């Protein structure tokens, strides 16, 4: 992920008159769609987007007072295929994306690696019942001399190794009976089973310990508790189960030390019994599964150039806590590693796409090849045996591998010029394919054509996909929100230029584009707004029109993250953004082939992105069985609905259409934790046939489904 919006390609701005002409030509050419006739019943899907920020001028269909439009589809003509991989997702170790959003683990800083407070307790942990306890009778010490596990395999990052810590607990005479430590803000539900464990090393401690879920406002009110008999000696794992009798979004998890003596505590865990494969929260899991992602990209993003995969395999409690150099130097637990990611991806129906570290933070080509062997090698191989020992004897069969992330950017470790990256790419490609020749490799591309040209010339024969990322924000909009609504059409022309470059350097149509990060950098109140969804929907229409080239795409980010995860999750709940809703609509209505279509629409002008930009953007596609047509339509007008005549040629359409729409009274409308359903998908039925009329609300995204034969 880039820290700023993507730079324009070199020499991209032409004189205004040429720009206007190119908009008209590119847009009209891009919207002609067709499909083959089918004798069986079939359905057509139409998606329409109306932008919400412009005042129309005299358009090709009449004066600005006339807000009518038309879509004419020729189902006998196919313009291009649409990749089944087109709608994927992107997941990164970023802020609370995984450790506080995706992961079901309820205990924060469970390995006690964060710096301690004045009481000697690591971050998120506090004395119980409060700081008035007798410090002498119950003392805590953040100890780096003893921690679990006692030893870990070394992974050389070229940095000073981070010491492992655990709290040493000294319980002496004079302490009150119910004393210990706790962690606050633990959301619990009545009747749900919570499975936990902790590791203890007992020196001369005598007695039991107690774990409990309690009220944070009614001190001492216990929802559930369990006693653990402590056995003297070296590190030992103690498991427990808690089933609270009451629900509480802000409960406390308490560990009490009623005995006397010294012990060490480490690796505390508490997971709800409903956790999904990979240790993922059930509510987040269900929202992701509803998106029907074709693939999920991980671990980054920028952080891919920080991450060392060996940190995240093996027994959960023996993994590293590492410093995330990309995102505020936060400490990251390794609970969600390779095994968990793959299990989670497959459980939601997605193919895993893994980004390997290229020369960042001490990473090597041998390490990348070893990662491929861990995932895809036989159990008789060195790293396949490691995978089998971790509980997965059969190879995972990971198909998609990305070789580095945004190497051209000085914000990532291992960044370089294009020549150096191309040489490194070839080394990595040879080593990784020597392990598994069947894998598909994704190379780092850019919005700068000079980078792409250099990489393709030197490494094109080894590339399956070229990854390009798009971010657009406040700086690029230059105070004109209409620029946002027009920007996807600039990218449509850019893809045509990339395609021309590919055909010049690499004969045939073998290399495809992966737009596996796209997003916006707007103020929060607009980042999650309907306005953002209009931009996203128009861009996804561009992806479908560019289907001969663009095969993979993913919005940034999936959960929390930066600049605007489409699922926003905190410990008490979640909401989805309007961009999530249009992602869901587009993914659910995936046609196999794009049909020829012509569109007539009012237009608007912008300060940076050209003139005569149509308010209406639409694509039509047909399912593989020929029984449905989907029309995806975006109305970007901020003020006017579009009365739209839809004509379908080359098939016989059914008498009723299904229309699903994302809109709201205001362009700035958004969801939040207090109002998670302020913006939602609205469904209605409408009369249809060979020619019919629909009203596309102002600033809206609609998907129209037609049964055809």
Task: Go through each PLM region and give its residues.
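Extracellular and organelle-lumenal recognition/adhesion modules and their flexible linkers in secreted
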Residues: 64-334, 351-355, 363, 369, ...
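Aromatic/acidic polysaccharide-binding cleft in carbohydrate-active enzymes
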Residues: 93-94, 480, 511-617, 627
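Carbohydrate-binding surface patches
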Residues: 227, 612-653, 659, 702-705
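Aromatic- and acid-rich polysaccharide-binding/catalytic face
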Residues: 266, 394-413, 452-491, 511, ...
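Glycoside hydrolase catalytic-domain groove-lining segments
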Residues: 326, 330-334, 340, 427-430, ...
């Amino acid at each position: 992920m880039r820290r700023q919006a993507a730079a324009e390609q070199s020499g991209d701005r032409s004189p205004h008159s040429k720009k206007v002409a190119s908009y008209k030509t590119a847009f009209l050419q891009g919207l002609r769609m067709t499909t083959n006739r089918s004798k069986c019943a079939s359905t057509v899907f139409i998606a329409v987007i109306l932008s919400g920020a412009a005042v129309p001028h005299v358009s090709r269909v009449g004066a600005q007072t006339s807000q009518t439009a038309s879509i004419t589809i020729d189902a006998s003509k196919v313009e291009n295929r649409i990749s089944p991989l087109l709608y994927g997702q992107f997941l990164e170790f970023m802020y609370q994306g995984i450790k506080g959003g995706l992961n079901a683990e309820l205990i924060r800083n469970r390995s006690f690696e964060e710096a301690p407070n004045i009481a000697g307790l690591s971050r998120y942990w506090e004395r119980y019942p409060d700081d008035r306890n007798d410090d002498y009778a119950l003392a805590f010490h953040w100890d780096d001399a003893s921690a679990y596990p006692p030893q870990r395999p070394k992974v050389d990052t070229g940095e000073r190794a981070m010491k492992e810590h655990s709290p040493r607990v000294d319980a002496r005479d004079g302490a009150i009976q119910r004393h210990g430590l706790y962690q606050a803000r633990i959301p619990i539900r009545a009747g749900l089973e919570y499975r936990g464990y902790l590791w203890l090393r007992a020196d001369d401690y005598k007695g039991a310990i107690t774990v409990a879920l309690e009220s944070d406002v009614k001190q001492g009110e216990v929802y559930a508790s369990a006693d653990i008999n402590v056995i003297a000696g070296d590190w030992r794992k103690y498991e427990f189960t808690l089933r609270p009798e009451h629900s509480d979004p802000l409960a406390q998890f308490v560990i009490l030390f009623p005995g006397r003596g010294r012990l060490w505590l480490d690796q505390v865990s508490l997971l709800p019994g409903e956790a999904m494969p990979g240790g993922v929260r059930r509510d987040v899991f269900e929202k992701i599964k509803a998106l029907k992602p074709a693939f999920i990209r991980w671990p980054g993003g920028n952080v891919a150039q920080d991450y060392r995969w060996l940190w995240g395999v093996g027994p959960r409690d023996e993994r590293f806590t590492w410093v995330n150099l990309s995102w505020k130097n936060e400490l990251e637990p390794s609970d969600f590693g390779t095994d968990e990611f793959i299990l989670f991806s497959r459980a939601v129906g997605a193919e895993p796409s893994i980004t390997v570290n290229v020369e960042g933070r001490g990473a090597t080509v041998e390490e990348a090849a070893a990662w491929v062997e861990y995932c895809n090698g036989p159990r008789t191989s060195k790293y396949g045996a490691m995978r089998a020992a971790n509980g997965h004897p059969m190879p995972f069969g990971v198909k998609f591998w990305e070789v580095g992330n945004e190497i051209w950017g000085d914000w990532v470790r291992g960044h370089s010029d294009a020549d150096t990256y191309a040489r490194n790419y070839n080394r990595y490609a040879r080593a990784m394919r020597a392990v598994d020749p069947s894998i598909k490799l994704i190379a780092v591309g850019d919005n700068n054509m000079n980078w792409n040209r250099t990489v393709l010339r030197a490494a094109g024969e080894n590339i399956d996909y070229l990854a390009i990322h798009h971010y657009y924000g406040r700086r690029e909009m230059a105070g004109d929100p209409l620029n946002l609504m027009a920007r996807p059409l600039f990218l449509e022309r850019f893809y045509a230029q990339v395609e021309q470059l590919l055909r010049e350097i690499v004969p045939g149509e073998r290399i495809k584009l992966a737009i596996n990060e796209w997003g916006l950098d707007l103020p929060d109140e607009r980042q999650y707004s309907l306005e953002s969804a209009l931009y996203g929907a128009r861009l996804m229409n561009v992806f479908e029109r560019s289907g001969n080239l663009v095969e993979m795409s993913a919005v940034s980010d999936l959960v929390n993250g930066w600049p605007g995860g489409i699922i926003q999750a905190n410990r008490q709940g979640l909401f989805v953004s309007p961009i999530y809703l249009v992602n869901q609509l587009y993914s659910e209505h995936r046609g196999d082939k794009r049909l020829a279509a012509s569109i007539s629409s009012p237009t608007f002008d912008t300060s940076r992105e050209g003139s005569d930009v149509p308010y209406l953007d639409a694509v039509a596609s047909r399912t593989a069985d020929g029984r449905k047509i989907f029309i995806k339509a975006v109305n970007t007008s901020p003020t006017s609905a579009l009365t739209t005549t839809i004509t379908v040629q080359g098939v016989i359409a059914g008498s009723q259409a299904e229309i699903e729409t994302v809109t709201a009274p205001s362009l700035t409308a958004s969801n939040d934790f207090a109002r998670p359903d302020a913006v939602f998908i609205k469904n209605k039925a409408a009369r249809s046939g060979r020619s019919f009329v629909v009203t596309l609300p102002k600033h809206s995204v609609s998907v129209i489904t037609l049964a055809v034969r």
